[in-house]
Amino acid sequence: MQKRAIYPGTFDPITNGHIDIVTRATQMFDHVILAIAASPSKKPMFTLEERVALTQQATAHLGNVEVVGFSDLMANFARNQHATVLIRGLRAVADFEYEMQLAHMNRHLMPELESVFLMPSKEWSFISSSLVKEVARHQGDVTHFLPENVHQALVAKLA
């Protein structure tokens, strides 16, 4: 039986830090579902459809990745996808407390769902979508932090 994992997030937009995590996850699991949350409360810059399309393009080189949008409760989504592993990236100690709370709640809702925490490579450890957007809004060069297609879309969105 295949080991299916979900890597959820808002990915507004997906960064090279996210690509780093999902690339390493593909080496650990047979099938990785990159699950893009609708997250209307976060008021994303890109629509869910745009985020899905950008992420599909940015991960096209990864053969065992499926990109899908979702708006369901994570535990329900994982159950429907027959996934038993939830991948989460941890950049800093500050991320840990929140992620621990999520992991405990997800385990309560779906006991067979295991949370696996991956640290990004040092090069990406300080990057977040929010930070990249903020720097780009002020005409800072964020080319290094985004896949090329995502960088082009961000520049167009801010124009």
From Swiss-Prot:
InterPro entries per the UniProt record, alphabetical: Cyt_trans-like, PPAT, Rossmann-like_a/b/a_fold
Binding-site list for substrate: 10, 42, 74, 88
Location(s) in or outside the cell: Cytoplasm
Site description Transition state stabilizer, residues in chain: 18
Cofactor: Mg(2+)
GO CC list: cytoplasm
Keyword line: ATP-binding, Coenzyme A biosynthesis, Cytoplasm, Magnesium, Nucleotide-binding, Nucleotidyltransferase, Transferase
Pathway: Cofactor biosynthesis; coenzyme A biosynthesis; CoA from (R)-pantothenate: step 4/5
MF terms (GO), sorted A to Z: ATP binding; pantetheine-phosphate adenylyltransferase activity
One of the protein's GO biological processes: coenzyme A biosynthetic process
EC number: 2.7.7.3
Catalysed reactions, semicolon-separated: (R)-4'-phosphopantetheine + ATP + H(+) = 3'-dephospho-CoA + diphosphate
CDD domains tied to this protein: PPAT
Residues the entry annotates as binding ATP: 10-11, 18, 89-91, 99, 124-130
Job of this protein: Reversibly transfers an adenylyl group from ATP to 4'-phosphopantetheine, yielding dephospho-CoA (dPCoA) and pyrophosphate.
NCBIfam families to which the protein is assigned, alphabetical: coaD_prev_kdtB, cyt_tran_rel
Subunit text: Homohexamer.
Similarity remark: Belongs to the bacterial CoaD family.
Name of the protein: Phosphopantetheine adenylyltransferase
